[in-house]
Amino acid sequence: MTNNDILIRLRYAFDIKNTEMVKIFNLGGMDYTKEEVLNMLIKVNDDEEAPEEYIKCNDKMLEGFLNGFITFKRGPQKPKPGQPEGPPAVSGKESPNNMLLKKVKIALALTSEEMLDILYDGGVSVSKGELGAILRNPSHRNYKECGDRFVRNFLRGLTYKYRD
């Protein structure tokens, strides 16, 4: 699952408009025009070649979008003295799938129980311990990398919960 697929599915799950997508990227510190964002949202199958205007979303772009999504959903946060302006950058060790789960959890202020319900709605049954392992810091000894199937089902569960 590519980062572009994640953007497309998040946009669908929360029914985010094109102008809101641009605003979310801007809130995350990324400056893109409406046309550039639309070019990121082009659906490309594995067996076909991407159109010339297609923009591949890298991990930094996805992280910027997710940081903007947190601000979009929760509002801007005033930094305390000595605290950095924005959210800390994710280390290169963390997979984009784990980053997605953590940042969506923060943006929607979800509890672990609510995340388990969303995953169940998406067709995955996991324990609280497994979810905790996915949400841990990559340097923790019990950290578990999140797979594409898990994220796909999480996004499906979000669609069921927030789209209907």
Task: List PLM regions with ranges.
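Charged low-complexity interaction tracts in eukaryotic proteins
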Residues: E49-K78, Y143-L158
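Short, amphipathic alpha-helical "recognition" segments used to contact nucleic acids or chromatin
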Residues: M1-F14, S95-A107
